[in-house]
């Protein structure tokens, strides 16, 4: 899995940063892409990346401010033009259905695939054999959500070397042992498959937040995450200003990461007042509180767990 930051700016596009969109690429895990927010010109950013719209399975919208949704109609239309036929699910606050359907209707856009809308409330919004996703409200004036994506633990690998050392020849019997079954060998000896399976591989946790000021609900969403993606619209000494505009500072994001025991913090949603050099200072500031912090730039790619 990896996170691809398609847009990392706040409010409006700038020369260095487009508005918000983040892709969670899971090609190895489920041959799919999940998209978090879709600001204006997201599809242009996708063309500059390795992402294929044909792999897009789900879109998650954090809130309905324009810099997070104005790219949706064009992206949905382009997916259709490119031959997309598989269903696409869009999750988001109440109003996302009306916004998308109205945009498509007024523009006379007809899609070649079905959109399934899921207007979310706090709690579990998705679960299958591989992942679960829970959401909770943040504090941004307009209803804004944070997403917690939990990968389920993977079964432990079969320790084939140990089996061979114990005299078990490779063959169909390995499949039964891999399932943890008890099997009887040709010589009459009995082995327990569970003795030859490594410990389950812990699934990853990714927390991706929409715009917010510092608020209590963030902690549970971020707790023990492998990666926390958090806005940092302002520098640390602008806490009062950030609060007035319902946003966060670098230091607030870093403090949350430390308190929540996350492994890596990635800062995004950077105000256009900060150029690339100033952004480096934002990073240094956050790292003074939480060392394993990165600052995202457009088209940056972050492998999960590294």
Swiss-Prot record:
Q: What is its EC number?
A: 3.1.26.11
| List of residues binding Zn(2+) 1 | 63, 65, 140, 211
Q: Which HAMAP family match?
A: RNase_Z_BN (MF_01818)
Binding-site residues, Zn(2+) 2: 67-68, 211, 269
**InterPro entries listed in its UniProt record:** Metallo-B-lactamas, RibonucZ/Hydroxyglut_hydro, RNase_Z/BN
MF terms (GO), sorted A to Z: 3'-tRNA processing endoribonuclease activity; zinc ion binding
The cofactor required is: Zn(2+)
What does the protein in this record do? Zinc phosphodiesterase, which displays some tRNA 3'-processing endonuclease activity. Probably involved in tRNA maturation, by removing a 3'-trailer from precursor tRNA.
Write out the catalytic residues in the record.
Answer: 67 (proton acceptor)
Q: Domain of life, per the record?
A: Bacteria
Record-given protein name: Ribonuclease Z
Q: Can you name the source organism?
A: Listeria monocytogenes serotype 4a (strain HCC23)
Query: In which family does this protein belong, per the annotation?
Result: Belongs to the RNase Z family.
Query: What does the Swiss-Prot or TrEMBL cofactor note state?
Result: Binds 2 Zn(2+) ions.
What CDD domains does UniProt report for this protein, alphabetically? Answer: RNaseZ_ZiPD-like_MBL-fold (cd07717)
Assembly notes: Homodimer.
Q: Under which main EC class is this enzyme filed?
A: hydrolase
Q: Which Pfam families match?
A: Lactamase_B (PF00753)
Q: Which UniProt keywords apply?
A: Endonuclease, Hydrolase, Metal-binding, Nuclease, tRNA processing, Zinc
| Reaction(s) catalysed (UniProt annotation) | Endonucleolytic cleavage of RNA, removing extra 3' nucleotides from tRNA precursor, generating 3' termini of tRNAs. A 3'-hydroxy group is left at the tRNA terminus and a 5'-phosphoryl group is left at the trailer molecule
